Amino acid sequence: MGEALNGLKRTMMCGEPREEHVGQKITLMGWVQRNRKLGGLDFIDLRDKTGIMQVVFGEEINSEAFEKAKSVRPEYCIAVTGEVVKRESVNENMPTGFVELKCESLKILSESETPPIYIKENLDAAENIRLKYRYLDLRRPDMHRIFEIRSKTTKSIRDYLEKNDFLDVETPMLTKSTPEGARDYLVPSRNYRGMFYALPQSPQIFKQLLMVSGFDKYYQIVKCFRDEDLRANRQPEFTQVDMELSFVEQDDIMALNEGLIAHVFKEVAGVDVKLPIKRMTFKDAMEKYGSDKPDLRFGMEITNITEDVKDMDFVVFKSAIEAGGSVRALCLKGGATLGRKPLDKLGEFVKTYKAKGLAWIQLKEDGVKSSIAKFLTDDVTNSIIETMGAETGDAILIVADKESVVFQSLGALRLELAKQFELIKDKNEFNFTWITEFPLFEYSEEEERYTACHHPFTAPMEEDLEFLESAPGKVRSKAYDLVLNGEELGGGSIRIHDMELQQRMFKALGFTEEQAWERFGFLLQAFKFGPPPHGGLAFGLDRMIMFLAGTENIKDVIAFPKNQNAYCYLSEAPNIADEKQLTELGIGILPKQEKQEQE
């Protein structure tokens, strides 16, 4: 049984003692990192979140403590009191390595079984074990550092926004399901049998209602939930830095958030963000980088060579051009040395992005080599080389198809080449850009209708309003994303604040007037009472912390994350609900086979 503190107070953290504390009597508390014997003495490395301190036990120092220390094992939680003395053998690798504590009193506060993971930095352990014993994983110093960064970041964000007159307002967690986008997490109501709340995917409608309420500037650091198929760096519940402002335009919101980013990155990471952050339209981003979140830490832009090859007698190029597609290419510097096997692998790679294949031209010292050599004339080859700005030693990698496939496949290939050939020279670089003028709609082949690229409340650009009903695919939006090193850090838009325009938007999305009022009636009703022009933005806090902490795994920055299947190894959630609870809610569970037949 563990001993009680009985009034004993910790006077210093384990990582704090230095030479100036020699001669002082202190009390430390923490966990045993390791213990060892040497020359009739026992040594314990005592650890807390600040670091490690060596504690020495000896018969001549204190016989009772010396005897007690013999039973101590790794991860025992203990308290030690004694005098700080200079170490005979200095350890310059530790901040506390010039001193040690001569233990005069030892309390074993609690014992520990042999831990399933070793508490150390850069732990190499299976993810399911780390998540099951997350409380042990979180004892590691590198994990503590991440959560100190997270805490410092949220404080920095709050300081900046409140200095700019933002008000922190909480919005409901139990809200209405408005199916549009990702699936909702549903919560059954006991009081309203057969009815459900939804956990919010974002506070979108409520923050707009706060603008109608005259709050002017709102922010919230808030949990959001999406029941979607998880990718590597997605979680079913995530944290968002959410904000909304009244009487603003796009430039106002972007300028404010540039200031926020500069403030946070300087205060938390000592990084100077160059302002103003550059801007790029969605169209330019797709045409140059094949992505609406381009990584600008390296070059290799996509180049359109359709004009150069339009007269070639090569059916792949010809059919793509005739179908309204294009032929585009990347120039890989030094790519002429690639053999047939790696080139074939790149061809297989682009096929995973629906491309039909990859044509290539290599500019070798002894001439041109190409997978489509028999279709190339000297004039066409020279024209392609000139357009691409290619030189001897380079390779030109070509895809022909409809533009969505060309952009997607070459965009992915560009990133793959950057990885293979280590084109990103400075891994610590933070390269920001704004992407603007997103399409307002995208066409869903599955649903056979247009869906909102962002959400149904995004304002269209005035000059494109004439196409809202006749050609929705042409309409650009007042939406903007902030991209960092090829990842979306945040996004937002100017909102529709006119009820008539909002109803037109719903109609363009295929909603009847009745459906629009059923789903969003509380917003439309509010729009009858003088809504101000407004807009906002939301940052993914978890992703921001990943950048600031230098980790590529989102699970590292969340205290108790789920795995890729939205399962919690620690608490074993989700679990089977009690039959009594289900009866109270009026819920019955279909057998698995019956459920599949229903589907």
Swiss-Prot record:
Alphabetized CDD domains for the sequence: AspRS_core (cd00777), EcAspRS_like_N (cd04317)
UniProt keyword annotation of Cell cycle present: no
Matching InterPro entries: Aa-tRNA-synt_II, aa-tRNA-synth_II, aa-tRNA-synth_II/BPL/LPL, Asp-tRNA-ligase_1, Asp-tRNA-ligase_1_N, Asp/Asn-tRNA-synth_IIb, AspRS_core, GAD-like_sf
List of residues binding ATP: R226, D227, E228, Q235, E488, G540, L541, D542, R543
Sorted UniProt keywords: Aminoacyl-tRNA synthetase, ATP-binding, Cytoplasm, Ligase, Nucleotide-binding, Protein biosynthesis
Recorded superkingdom: Bacteria
The keyword Cytoplasm is assigned to this record: yes
Residue positions binding L-aspartate: E180, R226, H454, R495
Reaction equation(s) it catalyzes: tRNA(Asp) + L-aspartate + ATP = L-aspartyl-tRNA(Asp) + AMP + diphosphate
One CC-aspect GO term: cytoplasm
One Pfam family it belongs to: tRNA_anti-codon
Subcellular location: Cytoplasm
GO molecular function: aspartate-tRNA ligase activity; ATP binding; catalytic activity, acting on a protein; nucleic acid binding; transferase activity
Subunit structure: Homodimer.
PANTHER family: ASPARTATE--TRNA LIGASE, MITOCHONDRIAL, ASPARTYL/LYSYL-TRNA SYNTHETASE
Family statement drawn from the similarity comment of this UniProt entry: Belongs to the class-II aminoacyl-tRNA synthetase family. Type 1 subfamily.
Identification of the protein by name: Aspartate--tRNA ligase
Protein's organism: Clostridium botulinum (strain Eklund 17B / Type B)
Gene designation per UniProt: aspS
